[in-house]
A protein has these predicted regions:
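Flavin (primarily FAD) binding-site architecture
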Residues: 172-186
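Conserved Rossmann-like nucleotide-cofactor binding loop
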Residues: 15, 38, 177
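Conserved structural-core and active-site-/substrate-pathway-adjacent residues in large, well-folded domains
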Residues: 9, 20, 56, 113-116, ...
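A short, Lys/Arg-enriched amphipathic alpha-helix followed by its capping loop at the start of a domain
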Residues: 18-28, 122-123, 169
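Beta1/beta-strand and adjacent pyrophosphate-binding region of the FAD-binding site
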Residues: 2-15
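Conserved beta-strand-loop-beta-strand element in the redox core of flavoprotein oxidoreductases
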Residues: 138-166, 170
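Active-site-adjacent segment of FAD-dependent monooxygenases/related oxidoreductases
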Residues: 41-122, 129, 138-147
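Glycine-rich FAD pyrophosphate-binding loop
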Residues: 24-45
Length: 186
C-alpha cells in the first residue's frame, strides 16, 4: 500500500528534527524516518549558536534550553609555553556586542534534539519513525512543477518489509547513509 504525505524527511538528526518541528508548528504533517533504533542518546555537537537559540525562541522552547544549558560568556586561548606545557595567551568575549539578544550556550545534543522532538509532538502530535532504511527515491519530473502533486516516490524498508510513500516534497538530512540516487537531488 502506498501512503501519501506532504513532506517526507529522511533523517532525524538536528537538521531533520528542526525542519519537522517548523513544519509541525505551522500544522504541516510529515513522515520523518531514521535508520537508528531510537532517539540520539549521546551528543555529537553540543554548542548552540545565538541564532539557533533565536530559532528555539520562535518555537517557544528557548526558556527551557537556556535554563538547562551552560552559558558561554568568554573564550580563552592557550599557547605552548615552550617547555611542554601551555599558557593562557588571551581571553575575549564570546560574542560581539549587538549580535543577538540570545547567548551562545552548550547543552548535550541529545537533550537539544529531545527539546525539538517534544515541541514537534506538542505542535501536532508528530513523531519520528525509527528503524527505517530509505532504499530508493524517484521523482516524476512531469509532475514536479505541480505543487499539489505527489511527485516523489520514496521506497523504504523496516524490519524486512518494504513500504512506499508518495510525497510532494522530500528533505534529506542524512546523506551519509542515503541511497546513491538521493545525492542527485540534494
Amino acid at each position: 500500500m502506498v501512503q501519501n504525505v506532504d513532506v517526507f524527511i529522511c533523517g532525524s538528526g538536528s537538521a531533520g528534527i528542526c525542519a519537522a518541528t517548523w513544519l509541525a508548528r505551522y500544522g504541516i504533517t510529515c513522515k520523518i524516518v531514521d535508520s537508528r533504533s531510537g532517539p540520539l542518546k549521546v551528543g555529537q555537537a553540543d554548542g548552540v549558536q545565538c541564532r539557533t537559540v533565536e530559532v528555539f525562541d520562535s518555537f517557544g522552547i528557548a526558556e527551557e534550553l537556556l535554563r538547562e544549558s551552560y552559558h558561554v560568556l568568554e573564550v580563552t586561548f592557550w599557547s605552548s609555553d615552550g617547555k611542554g606545557g601551555i599558557i593562557r595567551s588571551s581571553r575575549a568575549p564570546d560574542r560581539e556586542n549587538g549580535l543577538s539578544h540570545q547567548p551562545h550556550v552548550i547543552l548535550n545534543q541529545a537533550r537539544i534534539n529531545a527539546l525539538l522532538l517534544d515541541a514537534m509532538k506538542r505542535f501536532n502530535g508528530q513523531e519520528v519513525d525509527y528503524g527505517y532504511t530509505v532504499k530508493d527515491v524517484q521523482v516524476d519530473s512531469a509532475k514536479a512543477s505541480d505543487p499539489e502533486a505527489y511527485c516523489v516516490t520514496v521506497t523504504t524498508e523496516k524490519d524486512g518489509t518494504e513500504e512506499v510513500f508518495k510525497a510532494k516534497y522530500v528533505l534529506v538530512s542524512a546523506i551519509q547513509n542515503a541511497p546513491r540516487n538521493i545525492s542527485h537531488f540534494v
